[in-house]
């Protein structure tokens, strides 16, 4: 047996052990895996510096931005929905135009017609989150409004009358979206406690 075949068979024998160790760690929970492995496998972040810059500029939690991106597009900067939403943060072109007309974004740097550009998409998506934060009272309301619209969430807030806000949500899709984004927000906050661009 030549050296190359011997190395292959040695590697092949250890592969099942490596897989078993990985599966055991997963069954025990991701807390037993090295943090960098958890980050890269389960909670990746692309465009960390762009997110950090936009978060500071608009006073929005960068973990929230990452959670929205994860749930909206799965970090696919070319994602397009059947409804016409575009890019990382799945913005509707009309929404970007409205944000632009309100003067929330520097249109000399970020053209609202260029939502497939990750930096532009993050800028407009974060500006939208910032606008919703100013209009609404809680992070849950902001997340729900990003999905269902500001007017709808304001109606739900009025109807909640002291109940937990999530109980007043009448759209199953938005209720599920709120749960998913909140879970992603918890995980990004846990695994990136010092920020997205600090690894």
Identify the meaning behind each predicted range.
Residues 13-31:
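Hydrophobic membrane-insertion alpha-helices, especially the h-region
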Residues 1-11:
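N-terminal Lys/Arg-rich, disordered targeting/topogenic segments
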Residues 12-13, 145:
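Hydrophobic alpha-helical transmembrane segments of integral membrane proteins
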Residues 30-199:
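Catalytic glycan-binding domains that act on GlcNAc-containing polysaccharides
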